[in-house]
Amino acid sequence: MIDVQSRFDSRNIRVDKVGVKDIRYPITVMDKTNGIQHTVASVNMYVNLPREFKGTHMSRFIEILNEFHGNLDIREFPSILQSVQEHLSAESAHLELSFSYFIKKLSPVTGCAGLMEYGCRVAGSLDSNRGHDLVLEVNVPISTVCPCSKEISSYGAHNQRGMVRLAVRFKKFVWIEDLVRLVECAASSEVYSVLKRPDEKFVTESAFDNPKFVEDVVRDIAKELKADQNISWFLVDVENFESIHNHSAYACIERSK
């Protein structure tokens, strides 16, 4: 049959990324406690398109994805990217997985168990000139108490939930749980899925004793990452959904090591 995608394109413009986006697909994630965790990811797959070709072959992305069915996890990224690059005759290949990861957490006083959901993302690329690249990202909800509000108020301080996005490049394998724990330790308080009254009292009082600006949170996380020899690059940003303001508070640090 006629291959329209392989026809010559006269516009002489290279396409940086072309492919398929938002494929819902089952994946396996390494779980520090249970060995593995099954979840569902939103998958994006791209390649570059040379200036002389009209289009890429979209069906080949899905075929490659199906080849790795049952073994689609972070350890297979190099093999998947190489397969994409070879099958589509591309200079660069890209694979992105966005998924929910669940961690069992106990409430701090009564020990009630509940599952916390964390949004995660793994983005990998393979380039003929630059080689492999892999970034792991976690999104962690936190709670903060405003230091200024505590300092100037007689009856308490305003507090709010926030979201921390932490992305890292690493030399050896990194557990999602360890990144989550690093973030939660930098907050005024962790966020829990189940709290009884004794737990709520503890969380409220401990957060009040540990007030944090977004600047404090982002700096505390960056300090730990700078000392970690396994981390070669990181980006951390914090957004607080302010409870008494009509805006969010935001801070960001990005560093290469």
Curated annotation (Swiss-Prot):
Coiled coil: none
Key words of the record: Hydrolase
Reactions the enzyme catalyzes: GTP + H2O = 7,8-dihydroneopterin 3'-triphosphate + formate + H(+)
Pfam families listed in its UniProt record: GCHY-1
Superkingdom in the source lineage: Bacteria
Family matches, as PANTHER family: GTP CYCLOHYDROLASE MPTA
Function, as annotated: Converts GTP to 7,8-dihydroneopterin triphosphate.
Family statement: Belongs to the GTP cyclohydrolase IV family.
Listed name of the protein: GTP cyclohydrolase FolE2
Classification of source organism: Bacteria, Pseudomonadati, Thermodesulfobacteriota, Syntrophobacteria, Syntrophobacterales
